[in-house]
Amino acid sequence: MEAKAVARTIRIAPRKVRLVLDLIRGKEVAEAIAILKLTNKASSPVVEKLLMSALANAEHNYDMNIDSLVVKEAYANEGPTLKRFRPRAQGRASAINKRTSHITIVVADKEVKTSNTEAQEEAK
């Protein structure tokens, strides 16, 4: 079972958000929250809030146990770009692209390895 949360049109470039998401992907939820609290990036509070939202969705909508969840997926896609212009010398202008992100976090139950799957992995 899995639950997800999506934040759309967040005014941080996806390239910068991905740096933070890479830190928490595959981690247990408690560990991911601890990492986000100590990460000094502008997107950390946004990602932390989104992770808490995914946890609330898991608990409320699916009656999942929060203590046994891991961050299954975490990705940032590009949202709409705000195009602005900066005046330059001699009447020219330079384009400024203010990029936005659509951030998605999926939490799921830990996969418990059974002895059968372990035997199959050892056989490979």
Swiss-Prot record:
GO terms for biological process: translation. Keywords: Ribonucleoprotein, Ribosomal protein, RNA-binding, rRNA-binding. The keyword Hydrolase does not apply. GO terms for cellular component: cytosolic large ribosomal subunit. Disulfide bonds: none annotated. It comes from the Bacteria. The keyword Ribonucleoprotein applies. PROSITE patterns: RIBOSOMAL_L22. Part of the 50S ribosomal subunit. Belongs to the universal ribosomal protein uL22 family. This is Large ribosomal subunit protein uL22. It comes from Macrococcus caseolyticus (strain JCSC5402) (Macrococcoides caseolyticum). The lineage of its organism: Bacteria, Bacillati, Bacillota, Bacilli, Bacillales.
